[in-house]
Amino acid sequence: GWKKFKELSGVLCGKRWSLKLKGRVYRVCVRTVMVYGGETWVMRKEEEGVLRRAERAMVRMMSGVKLRDRKSSGELMSMAGLCEDIVLVVRRSRLRWYGHVLRKTENDGIREVLEVVVPGKVGRGRPKLGWQEEVRKDMERVGLRVGDAKDRGRWRGGAFELPS
C-alpha cells in the first residue's frame, strides 16, 4: 500500500486538489492495493491494527494536518470521504468470496481445497484461528447461514450489513 501511495504522492499530498477528491483517488488506487487478496487472510488484531494505522497515517499526510493541530483521525477520515473501516472492507470481501465458493458445484476444485483435512498429528495447545472459523464468526455477526449462499441477494445483503 505504501508503495502505491508514494507513487501517487504528487496527487495525494499536493495542495492542488480537495481532500474529498484525494480520498476518492486513495480509495480507488491505494486502498484496493492494500486489501488485495484480503479474501484469503486470517487477520489477527495486530494485522488489523497495522492496516488501520497505515490508513490513518496516509490520510493525515493527504490532509497536511499534523498531530499538533489536534484534529482527530475520525474527522480527517470523514472529511476525505473514508467513513468505512478498512478491516470491514476486508471482512466483506472475505464473505463475498466465501459465498462465491459455496455456490460452486460439490466436485469443483476450490470446494475440495476448502474442505480438505490435513492428516497428521495436531500440536499441543490451542490451535490458531483458521480461515473458516474467521468466516463463520463474520457470518454469525450478520445472521447468515451456509445455505443462504444460494440466494445471492440475501448473501450480498448480509455481507453489507457487517458491523465493525
Short names for language-model regions:
Residues 1-164:
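Short linear motifs embedded in intrinsically disordered, charge-biased segments
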